[in-house]
Amino acid sequence: MAEIEKVKCLIIGSGPAGYTAAIYAGRANLCPVLYEGLQPGGQLTTTTDVENFPGYPEGISGPQLMEDLRAQASRFGTDVRFGIATAADLSKAPYKITIDGDKVIETESLIIATGATAKYLGLEDEKKYAGMGVSACATCDGFFYRKKVVAVVGGGDTDRKSVV
């Protein structure tokens, strides 16, 4: 049987929501443990220019923003770890979360901030140009393409409306 580690507050996910939760939990002396998941820093790490985040009037790169949030969470005592939640027993508290298939963490406070994952088409060089013309968020990046010809694939009516 796997050894069980007990923590006050467990956060799964390292995007803006995960790190913001970690900052607040740390300031509340909950000793948060945050597991980064598959993409440390979340989707923003693939964004070149973030101009709609408060506090950065000149904008900031996605990777830099996530480094800043990580540093602030660490400043307030967050234990940031690499690992992937592979199973969860949420039937009753304390909750049991399995990390990487073999480590079990038990917690009374669980924050799941796993965010979203963009669906790409699988075209050659698509990932190479992510954030440099290829975007997965019309709401986030539409501003950069004002008065330009664009192609929108997927998203139902949502992205088409965002483009207009």
Which role fits each region the language model picked out?
Residues L34-T46:
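N-terminal glycine-rich anion-binding loops that anchor highly charged ligand groups
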Residues M1-C9, E67, R75, G83, ...:
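Extreme N-terminal leader/targeting segments of oxidoreductases
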Residues E5-V7, I99-S109:
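Core beta-strand elements of the Rossmann-like FAD/NAD(P) dinucleotide-binding domain
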Residues L110, T114-C137:
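Glycine-rich beta-alpha-beta "Rossmann" dinucleotide-binding loop(s) and their flanking helix/strand
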Residues T45-V104:
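N-terminal Rossmann-like dinucleotide/flavin-binding domain of flavoprotein oxidoreductases
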Residues A2-K6, I11-G37, A130, A136-V164:
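Rossmann-like dinucleotide/flavin-binding elements
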Residues I12, E106, I112-A113, V152:
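Redox-cofactor binding/interface segments in oxidoreductases and associated redox assembly factors
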Residues T20, L44, A113:
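Short alpha-helical segment within the catalytic ATP-binding CA
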